[in-house]
Amino acid sequence: MKENQLIQLVEEMTIDEKINQLLQLAAAFYSDKAEEKTGPMSELGLSQETIDTAGTTLGVSGANEAKRVQKEYMQNHRLNIPTLLMADIIHGFRTIFPIPLALGSTWDEAAVEKMAEISAKEAAVSGLHVTFSPMVDLVRDPRWGRVMESTGEDPLLNSRLAAAMVRGYQGENLKEDNWRVAACVKHFAAYGGALAGRDYNTVDMSERQLREMYLPGYKAGIDAGAKLVMTSFNTVDGIPATGNQWLFRDVLRNEFGFEGVVISDWGAIKELIPHGVAKDEKQAAELAIKAGVDIEMMTTCYPDYLKELLEEGRIAETLIDEAVMRILKLKNELGLFENPYRGADEQAEAEVILSKEHREIAKKIAQKSMVLLKNENILPFTPQEKIALVGPGAQSQDILG
């Protein structure tokens, strides 16, 4: 689509359709198995219209399922706008690579870029469009529970590998290369700087430290062309990132020149309430949309309250229109208006995923990532020796790495 066609499409949308475009729902809402909608998902109280027009979907798995979800979604959408399928692909999709912390130990940009390229290929043939990676949160406290998702403590290495991952995931042209996916730099900002290493905790540092140590990784990913940025759960200078206009309007948009989509982390908009900056979901929606958060992930502050805020004059419709336009532009950059089933291919899925070539490359990168911290006559191994891998996770692919 040309940009004037996207503008016309926004003009044709009702206010409810616009607002729902800003909502991301889990794949369970589009499952043909009712039992999958359990726990918090069953308590959201969403109308069928909201489900049918929510703009993006989280966690669809497999080419066949991706095509089914996309087909039914477009049939139910009055304007036939496609959904956008996203997932966390952190260190491999089906072929598992070393964790990002180990990837940092390779000091090898080409290897990390190759990891991202293979991950994108496997994800794309399975029908996915966006990965929530790279995580470029600089971390210097080993007590933090997400250390393994970071590439380490060095700003330069962090930046170089962030850019390498973005290049690997996205390639040179997302519309023409259906075996690539859009990259989402996360978590903006300074999520890895939580006090005492406690996840979601306060981040308390000088602006100089923030700019010199923590922000360069995000900027490197953005300069490499990342299409999305995800908000962090923490506060920065006392203000939660998801409602922080200075972070997203002044720094991300104006200083860094980022023009892509900003998405909240899971439930982060509603979490503005326990942070103490919003008294209810309505105020949380107001703070987030004013800060520039385009997509709300898995809470319903936007669909429940943006229209009311608009009618009360507390927000301008241009805020909603700008967010919708950024989402539609991303869908257009991926070629979804022309090819809504982009990449999804059961035959390619069977041939590409866990291929011998991919597993061999993963093995070589794993070898590069290994660091012997203390050698007490361990090396070299003799051919007659065997190594036992034991423990509750030894056979678990879910926590491999």
What are these regions (language model features)?
Residues 1-401:
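Glycoside hydrolase catalytic-domain context in secreted enzymes
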